[in-house]
């Protein structure tokens, strides 16, 4: 087939025998990798039989795997996702990497699922295993396991980026789930933490749109009430880059007053640049701009408008 003209070959699927990295190796530069992500909320909603609010609630809990989007009952969705997580993802990772059992990597997935949007690294996770699991899983093994989870497209890693220093900070970092439904299934749908899940969804959406997404760190100096010069550090949830374009995005579930708005936008002020700055909130609101040019937009409005970053 490789010798025939006008013929494209698509090799699909990843399993314990053949991951996408193996496909690229086999074709030795003659092929391209296309990462097929779960459905975006816009895609999910286009086929959803219900209101926008109902669709988002479903999407947050059960994610965007196409098979799930076609299922009618919550029981069907939850059973399917739990089975996929246990009998497909975990089993394939164990088989692929010749692990002796699934216990350690399963426990690691549980810990990571409970801590989405939190800064972490292998050393911190090693300490968690010691204190919570009474286990001695070393940092180097944890780092290796995280690599396996990324290779299987279960997790995605967001590095920290020093905005003013223009450099990456290797550790700690954040890990997000490629699909929130799989994350929730791993925890048997017990921890539906809307604040963290919304952040995960925004991260995934930015990647769907083709952006490289980092966690922003802004360091600055500030004088205390006593006049002492101190160094401070604030975080921007996401720095989205694509070529010469950059956007700063904060995920804020609720902004009840001006004080909370100031807290969320303070990191924007410290960047000292003119890139677009956006705060996404859970409440359904049309885009609005303050006197500094910062935009507030509702999560559903943000997800359903492909041009929402440029409003």
Where are these regions (language model features)?
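A short alpha->loop->secondary-structure connector
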Residues: 1-6, 25-33, 237
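Short, polar loop motifs at secondary-structure junctions
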Residues: 16-18, 280-287
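Accessory nucleic acid-recognition modules appended to NTPase machines
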Residues: 74, 79-246
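Active-site ExK catalytic segment of metal-dependent nucleases
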Residues: 241-256, 264
């Amino acid at each position: 087939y490789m010798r025939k003209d006008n013929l494209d070959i698509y090799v699909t699927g990843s399993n314990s025998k053949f991951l996408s990295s193996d496909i690229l190796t086999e074709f030795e530069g003659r092929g391209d990798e296309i990462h097929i992500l779960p459905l975006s909320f816009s895609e999910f909603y286009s086929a959803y039989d219900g209101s926008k609010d109902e669709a988002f609630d479903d999407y947050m809990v059960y994610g965007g795997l196409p098979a799930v989007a076609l299922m009618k009952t919550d029981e069907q969705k939850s059973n399917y996702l739990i089975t996929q997580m246990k009998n497909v993802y975990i089993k394939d990772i164990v088989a692929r990497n010749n692990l002796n059992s699934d216990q350690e990597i399963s426990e690691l997935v549980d810990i990571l699922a409970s801590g989405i949007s939190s800064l972490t690294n292998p050393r911190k996770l090693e300490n968690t295993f010691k204190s919570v699991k009474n286990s001695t899983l070393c940092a180097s093994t944890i780092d290796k396991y995280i690599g396996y989870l990324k290779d299987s497209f279960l997790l995605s890693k967001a590095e920290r980026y020093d905005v003013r220093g223009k450099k990456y900070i290797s550790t700690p970092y954040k890990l997000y789930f490629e699909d929130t439904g799989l994350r929730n299934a791993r925890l048997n749908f017990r921890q539906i933490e809307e604040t963290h899940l919304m952040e995960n969804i925004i991260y995934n959406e930015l990647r769907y749109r083709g952006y490289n997404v980092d966690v922003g760190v802004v360091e600055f100096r500030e004088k205390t009430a006593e006049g002492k010069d101190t160094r401070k550090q604030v975080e921007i949830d996401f720095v989205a880059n694509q070529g010469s374009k950059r956007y700063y995005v904060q995920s804020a579930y609720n902004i009840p007053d001006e004080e909370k708005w100031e807290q969320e936008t303070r990191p924007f002020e410290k960047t000292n640049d003119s890139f677009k700055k956006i705060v996404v909130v859970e409440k359904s609101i049309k885009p609005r701009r303050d006197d500094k040019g910062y935009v507030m937009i509702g999560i559903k409005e943000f997800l359903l408008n492909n041009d929402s970053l440029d409003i």
